[in-house]
Structure formats: C-alpha cells, structure tokens
Amino acid sequence: MGQLGALLHLVDPTLPIGGFNHSNGLETFVQQGKVNSRASLEEYVQTQLMQNWIYNDGAYLSLAFDAMANHDLDRLLALDQELAASKIARESREGSYKLGVRLLKIFIRYENHPLLSEFQQAVSEKRCQGYFPIVFAMVAQAMNLDKAETLYAFYYNAAVGVVTNGVKLVPLSQMDGQDILFALRTPLAQAVENSLNPDLDWLGAATLASDIRSMQHEQLYTRLYMS
C-alpha cells in the first residue's frame, strides 16, 4: 500500500507545480478549429500518446528510470540535455523544466536519495535544466515504484491534463471528458508496453503539427494557458 500512496502523491493534480497552466499547443488547435468536438479531442489525445509522448517524454522517462536505478548521474544529465534538444517550442520547453524543478523541490524533502541532491546541485550549477519527465522518473525510482506503473501514471496524468483543458476550451461536457478517458485505457496500456524498452532509433521523433501549434501559441491574441 505504501507504493500506491507514493505513486498517487507523485501524480496528485493538487501538487503546486503549475501543470494546469499548460496546454502544450492544444489551445492553438482549438482556436484554429482543428479540435472542436469530443471525437476530435479524443483523436488528438490518442495521437499525442502514440505518436509523441511514447517517443519523447515517456521514452526519456523510461531511460531516466533505468539510469536512476543504475546510479548513473552522467546518464541522467545527458538525457536531460537530449530532451531539451527535442523540445522545439520555447513555451513547452520552458514549461517542462519549470514543472520539473518544482517537482524536485517538493520530493527532495521526503526522499533521502543522494542522486536527487546531486541532480538538484547540477540544476543550480546550470549543468542541466531538470525537465519534468527526468525528475518524475528519478523521484519514482527513489521511491522504489514499479516502472510500468510509473509510466502508466505518467501517461494517464498527461492525458487527464489534455482532456481537462480540452473540455474547458472547446467546450465539452464533463461526461465527454470521462468517456474519452475511459476509451484511453487500452491505448495507455499499449503505450506503457512500448515505452518499457524504448527504441532509440525513434527517440525524439518530431510531431510537426504539434510543434508548430506550440510555437504559434506565443502569438495568439487571447490565451488562457502559458503554452
């Protein structure tokens, strides 16, 4: 039960890290009319999951989890730098490391793991940024969480964020949002399976439409979100 409690704490939407402030380009898709219904929002989330997250944030989380288990700080720093290079849009890039730094600040108070302290020192010395998936993986491994369950929780948390924002932006009913999350159960499980041992040849695969909308977000006339 202790691991379940730790995992629920790690993905608690009330964590004061500011995740609710970011749409990562979804707001642009909605304003351009690309996402305008339950069906299009569900398609958007599944596309992000299976064509973006499993090759980017999820893949780097998986690799960072293994590096943390091997007590390999150099590998963690390298993964953080590689992830930075894969995040083309400034708002999404800055949003990710701000979330990561805040997450680290919270959990370093509870987990007495030397690599967390060393990584925090590396962030303060600007040897890395501290991107959210990297920190998430480090904290999860420090708490001895199961890797597959950590990945599922990470993906589910990301999906909930997208659906919550989409319901607000389109707008849709709350039940539409719940129906989308229910439909994601099988794709989420498949994403976890694909991410346990990431294909390095696909690491950092670009999702151009999403990257472009994330960059266009900076120029929107009105915005509810920071990215």
UniProtKB/Swiss-Prot annotation:
GO terms for molecular function: nickel cation binding. Pfam families: UreF. It comes from the Bacteria. One of its GO terms (cellular component) is cytoplasm. The keyword Chaperone applies. It is found in: Cytoplasm. Keywords: Chaperone, Cytoplasm, Nickel insertion. Required for maturation of urease via the functional incorporation of the urease nickel metallocenter. Belongs to the UreF family. UreD, UreF and UreG form a complex that acts as a GTP-hydrolysis-dependent molecular chaperone, activating the urease apoprotein by helping to assemble the nickel containing metallocenter of UreC. The UreE protein probably delivers the nickel. This is Urease accessory protein UreF. It comes from Actinobacillus pleuropneumoniae (Haemophilus pleuropneumoniae).
